[in-house]
């Protein structure tokens, strides 16, 4: 577990109950910065193990991280812990998160972790926990599915934590007039970098930095328009794509005609032409193509418009 500094502990149940009953808990505000003038909040993220089988068991919580901050988003403490689990980890999960089985086998058990989470939230008098996406649902399903043997005390604590959690994806997506965006995309359009670590604490800190940027500085209208265009074109591209592998027994004549059409389609700068071109390419050559990443798309759009958007690390 990682922490910056820790206040003296108080009564967990009493203070979390007090925070839950605050009027501000039930209010939806599109500007968290305003709440921070008088309250402490946390930004939280989780990592969870999902089944690779369609219709398989619910996701299992294996890591939790959060950052607590006050006025002007100033951090006061950080917390991170893995949660003990004996499950076998599939390759994709390990590649994305960097979590290895030994990390979970040596981690504290679920009850210890969640009680420590509650103690930290109570110690800093956190009034609200903000997440982006399904974290609340994952914690809730995990509690019902995998934590049947935990104590009543821990179960009550986790349920109180759940009542403190608010998913702000919908609120801030509406604020930015975006259908939906992940942490990685938001980092890019806010100029906060391009990498997403898939580490619970790092992603919680990224979320805090993104919301701070949106609330205090706002997002570039140019970047938001690119994001909207990217989302729309990506949806059309994958809706039009039909083929994912090379066709067998394609005659030389058809291949030559298709390659000729590919050259012509390369001159047409539309998403429909790109989808058809990529279908023909994979059918004839087996070369699989995908839609550009947001970062690649932004670079291309900036070349068109002559704009230069520098990364925060550029000097």
Question: Could you describe each region identified by the protein language model?
Answer:
Residues 1-57, 69-77, 102-315:
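DEDD superfamily 3′-5′ metal-dependent exonuclease/proofreading module
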Residues 60-62:
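Short coil-to-beta strand junction motifs in C2/discoidin
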Residues 64-68:
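Short beta-strand scaffold segments in enzyme catalytic cores
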